[in-house]
């Protein structure tokens, strides 16, 4: 479905030698050195550059939200999309600060927003089905979502972008992400479900019960990651998954945000494992399950700030660190350049 090249490690020794001979002790820049190696593998060993980075925020509603798994009603998804367009959300503040170009994509909120310019229409429906009662969507909708996401990534690629970051908005989407995590890792639902928007104990118990119910209902169809997305996914999660795969196919880097985005990343890796090396995991969120999912993927996030907002906020904050890794690799003098003998 996606022709993703296995990362070329042929020049790892050359890249590592360039890193090791900078004017610093070996390993002194820690995880930035590992990051620089990854970036040079993808974007080129000589002088990699981050070009036209794009923050893509995908929004959609979830049928399970009507069963009381969140403190917020589904209408908040639409209200937050309006907030994004008006520039008033955390993701707007952070993307302005770090120089990310932001776009907002309606993948399937309850109702289209009329008379609001700036929202990109990639609707797959008016919210998903309640996953504890029936499939979230058809397999055809998953494939359509992949096509939409691919077309959008291709547009950015044609405009010179070589790095995308993915954020989301969707009341109820932590339930969907937890179900995807459980299905694709084999972990227990109770270990994957967290408190999301800050729900109380009663709501938390209900949320775990409904996710377990969803996993039992769709059990016979959960061997295939595409079917997992159809049964348990969200329209925004599907399109994030497709965008990750499409970006890797085009030799672009992908910044993965928090819990929801990591569930999409997990699905993408199950579909095509080669996508993994194109992913940079931005942060460890405070949502229960994220640590275990990161460990399952053997992913070491750049930041740990106790955040659990979503929207792509962690991914936005990671961009300066990614740029710092590129800059030290390209611009820092070697011992020979500096005339330092050791």
Curated annotation (Swiss-Prot):
It catalyses: 5,6-dimethylbenzimidazole + nicotinate beta-D-ribonucleotide = alpha-ribazole 5'-phosphate + nicotinate + H(+). Keywords: Cobalamin biosynthesis, Glycosyltransferase, Transferase. The active site is at 311 (proton acceptor). Pathway: Nucleoside biosynthesis; alpha-ribazole biosynthesis; alpha-ribazole from 5,6-dimethylbenzimidazole: step 1/2. One of its GO terms (molecular function) is nicotinate-nucleotide-dimethylbenzimidazole phosphoribosyltransferase activity. Its EC number is 2.4.2.21. GO terms for biological process: cobalamin biosynthetic process. It is an enzyme of class 2 (transferase). PANTHER family: NICOTINATE-NUCLEOTIDE--DIMETHYLBENZIMIDAZOLE PHOSPHORIBOSYLTRANSFERASE (PTHR43463:SF1). This is Nicotinate-nucleotide--dimethylbenzimidazole phosphoribosyltransferase. It comes from Shewanella halifaxensis (strain HAW-EB4).
